[in-house]
Amino acid sequence: LPVMRPLVLEYEKDINTHNMNDEFMIGSQLLAAPVVEQGATKRMVYLPSGEWVDYWTKEHIAGGQYIIRDAPLDTCPIYVKAGTILPKYPVEAYIGTKEQKKLILEVYAGDGEYEHYQDDGLDFAYEQGAYNLYRFSHTGNGELEEKLLHEGYPKYEEIEIKYIP
């Protein structure tokens, strides 16, 4: 599946997603609802079933409904599925300035699992096994379990965990 995809690919049984063309999924855990109407100050957003978290405000919202969201020019409405483990890297001037030594994981309340791939991003050394594959999982108890499924590359020096209640 493509990284950016229509909601219907994730929620094919939900008839509300069948003709939706102004919201999309980023992977299976993030929903983006960009403002597409000029001059709009509010945006109607459909959230499929399940629990969602507003990425910006961290407000929990029940899915299976339409909501009205303020739509300032500088903020795209983004919603995170409960239980998501969202990977991030520290802010850089531009990508590729240095090797990534720190991984930041935002862990959203609920049960979830995430596989993370790490290599140098520069060559084909991964074909000879020069990569790491991690599996992170958690349940509602707030504990994050890390398993290294494949080790063939220097591990992160630091993995910072940020719990999002």
What role is predicted for each listed range?
Residues 1-164:
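Catalytic core of carbohydrate-active enzymes
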